[in-house]
């Protein structure tokens, strides 16, 4: 009798798996909304932990379906709603896709104003992650340090808590649109490459060797000297420094090396 009950629970509970991409996640949202499956959760197939009481179903990424969902979010909910979802997604939280799916179902049913109901568990599950990612993005927009390499390519390495590469790519493709640059996340072996026309993200394990441009060597020397001279010993406040710039980020800063 117990085995039959367990079997029924397992067969009736479906979870969707996707390829880890934002488009893959939105495809799952589409399928969950229009199919009869009514999945209990959506998970990245590469990090999914098998559940005895759930039947996984892999959903192939469909760009047309994901585009429809993205468009529906913007048109029926709001751009703010969409940006919250994007930021939350790049937190890489294990349950983030499930949280997003449930919030979207709630939002499409009740309207765009639900994003303001931050005390609601379906809303806070996404908004809290989005805000954490957004704070770190804002920090790195002013914190990343590009080095000019011989050949004119600008290179930056950093180690964020969240997956900031796609978010910073969007910012710097406008800010530094006339330069060729690479932003390298050393924690994830991931980088965004920009060639003055478009950017793309790929796996990247770093440069085997590189030579700094002569002008860059001079700049780094001047910057370190400047930082040393303004840090008057009596006024050095490590606690305050850490509050503005967490120490875990220091090793990638020119002035801290």
Regions found by a protein language model. Name each.
Residues 180, 191-192, 196, 211-257:
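Long, compositionally biased intrinsically disordered terminal regions
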Residues 60-65, 199-211:
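Acidic, Ser/Thr-rich peripheral helices and adjacent loops at domain boundaries
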């Amino acid at each position: 009798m117990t085995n039959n009950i367990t079997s029924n629970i397992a067969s009736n509970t479906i979870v969707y798996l996707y390829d880890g991409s934002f488009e893959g996640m939105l495809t799952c949202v589409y399928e969950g909304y229009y199919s009869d499956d009514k999945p209990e959760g959506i998970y990245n197939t590469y990090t999914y932990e098998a559940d005895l009481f759930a039947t996984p179903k892999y959903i192939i990424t469909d760009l047309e379906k994901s585009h429809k969902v993205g468009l529906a979010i913007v048109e029926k909910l709001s751009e703010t709603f969409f940006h919250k979802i994007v930021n939350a997604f790049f937190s890489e939280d294990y349950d983030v896709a499930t949280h997003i799916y449930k919030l979207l179902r709630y939002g499409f049913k009740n309207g765009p104003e639900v994003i303001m109901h931050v005390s609601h568990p379906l809303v806070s599950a996404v908004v809290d992650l989005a805000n954490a990612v957004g704070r770190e993005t804002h920090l790195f927009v002013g914190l990343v340090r590009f080095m000019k390499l011989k050949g004119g390519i600008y290179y930056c390495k950093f180690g964020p808590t969240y997956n900031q590469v796609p978010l910073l790519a969007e910012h710097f493709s406008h800010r530094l649109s006339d330069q060729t640059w690479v932003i390298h996340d050393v924690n994830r072996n991931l980088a965004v490459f920009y060639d003055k026309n478009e950017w793309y993200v790929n796996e990247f394990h770093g440069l085997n060797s590189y030579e700094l441009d002569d002008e860059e060597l001079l700049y780094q020397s001047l910057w370190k000297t400047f930082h040393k001279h303004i840090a008057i010993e009596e006024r050095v406040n490590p606690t305050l420094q850490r509050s503005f710039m967490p120490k875990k980020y220091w090793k990638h800063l020119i002035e801290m090396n």
